[in-house]
C-alpha cells in the first residue's frame, strides 16, 4: 500500500492498531479506526461530527461497546493485528476522496468520510 498519509492520519492508524492489540483483536477493523479518530482530542473528526449534531461522547460509548463484540485471541502465539479487508476498503476510499479533491495526502477528514461511506455495518450507520 503506497498511500500517503498526513501525520494525524498516521497517528490515527497507529492508534487503531494499538486499540486492536489491547483488545486482543487479530484484525484492525473500521471500528478501531473510528475509535482512534474519536480519541484525537483536538482532532478535526470530533469537531466535524459535533458540528453536524452527532453526540460524540455517546458515539464513543457505542463504539467502545461494539469493540468488545469483535473476535479476540490471547496467548503467546498471537501476532500483531493486521488490517482487515474492510479496513483496506476504507483506506482505499479515503485515498480516492483525497485524489478527487486534488490532495496529495490522506487526512483525517478523508478517513472520516470513507468511514461514513464505506465503513460497513456498525460504523457507517452510526455516522450517517
PLM regions: where:
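Histone-fold recognition with a strong bias for associated Lys/Arg-rich disordered tails
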Residues: 1-128
Amino acid at each position: 500500500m503506497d498511500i500517503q498519509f498526513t501525520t494525524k492520519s498516521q497517528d490515527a492508524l497507529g492508534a487503531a492498531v494499538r486499540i486492536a492489540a489491547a483488545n486482543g483483536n487479530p484484525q484492525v477493523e473500521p471500528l478501531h479506526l473510528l475509535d482512534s479518530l474519536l480519541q484525537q482530542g483536538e482532532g478535526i473528526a470530533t469537531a466535524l461530527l459535533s458540528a453536524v449534531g452527532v453526540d460524540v461522547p455517546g458515539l464513543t460509548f457505542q463504539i467502545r461497546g461494539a469493540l468488545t463484540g469483535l473476535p479476540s485471541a490471547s496467548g503467546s502465539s498471537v501476532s500483531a493485528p493486521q488490517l482487515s479487508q474492510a479496513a483496506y476498503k476504507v483506506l482505499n476510499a479515503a485515498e480516492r476522496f483525497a485524489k478527487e479533491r486534488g490532495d496529495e495526502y490522506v487526512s483525517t477528514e478523508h478517513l472520516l468520510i470513507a468511514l461514513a461511506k464505506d465503513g460497513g455495518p456498525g460504523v457507517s450507520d452510526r455516522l450517517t
